[in-house]
Curated annotation (Swiss-Prot):
Protein name: Probable nicotinate-nucleotide adenylyltransferase
Domain of life: Bacteria
Pathway in which this enzyme or protein is active: Cofactor biosynthesis; NAD(+) biosynthesis; deamido-NAD(+) from nicotinate D-ribonucleotide: step 1/1
Enzyme Commission code: 2.7.7.18
One Pfam match: CTP_transf_like
Organism encoding this protein: Borrelia turicatae (strain 91E135)
Cited PANTHER family: NICOTINATE-NUCLEOTIDE ADENYLYLTRANSFERASE-RELATED, PHOSPHOPANTETHEINE ADENYLYLTRANSFERASE
Amino acid sequence: MRIAILGGTYNPVHVGHMFLAKEIEHFLNVDKILFIPTHKPVHKCVENISVKDRIAMLKLAVQHENNMFIDECDIINGGITYTVDTIACIRNKYVHDDIYLVIGDDLFESFDSWKNPEKIIDSVNLVVVHRIYSERLVSRFKHTYIDNRIFSISSSEIRSRIEQGLPVDYLLPFDVLQYIKSNNLYVKGK
């Protein structure tokens, strides 16, 4: 089986994440896509939103997709989890499968400073997706590049819009938007 893994905070999950998953499914011809929400990201602060809420929103986003699943290995491990540890967890479950680690070019830029990047490369097929750079990044690490220029929206931008009272309709899966509204998430002063 061919499995793509997409890690992130998903704070909140948005249409850019979902469209990217569909692009990965198409271009890599994968059988399964695993969304892996981080418990506590190494380089980000998860502001005032519980892990429970982030998982609930992700479940709503993938509920109608037959080959998209959530793996909570980073949540179960707790604390800060490094990608190399996440991959070891996934490898234990999918020993004989082809695993594709999908990361944005913004993260790929510093890939050589990650914990055990060589071990990551030895364990998975690295896929780099265009996010911010106009040119492809050069690297000593073997990777496949996907030019995904459709959605340049970010979770932080969506949080900011909600905090400012600006519309976010159509930037989020409908059920995720309803969850955010029902639970009063990302509202200024909360």
